[in-house]
Amino acid sequence: MPVKADITIDNIDLDDVQGVVLPGGMPGTLNLEANEKVLEAVKYSCEKGKIVAAICAAPSILGHLGILDGKKATCFPGFEKELKGADYTGTHTVTDGNIITAKGAGCAIEFGHAIVSLAVSKDAADKVIGDMQCL
């Protein structure tokens, strides 16, 4: 079953979004990092204090862009050296200011909770988790 996007990166007004989420994986992370429009969206979101979230291998992109300098962060095991300037925690999910990083797919619920906590509120995130009957 094909998935159809309702909007493409060419049609996004970055002033209208709360931030960006980089899903990671391989070769997904390499494809994201090779796309200049994705990198522009990440940099713009960071500069404007919007949410910048990355999971699995994708935090490496933030490291390469210098976004993690002085920030606590985590990533999929084996990508730690790519988190340039970061204080690597090794925990499942880390929120440092507007930056959220997570280790991998097994941390997706926690990662989503962190995103909703910043985008809406911790109470809203807790309600979503409660309604899903997890964590």
Language-model features, listed with the residues they occupy:
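Charged, often glycine-rich, active-site loop that binds/positions anionic groups
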Residues: 1-3
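Active-site-adjacent pocket-lining segments in enzyme domains
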Residues: 5-135
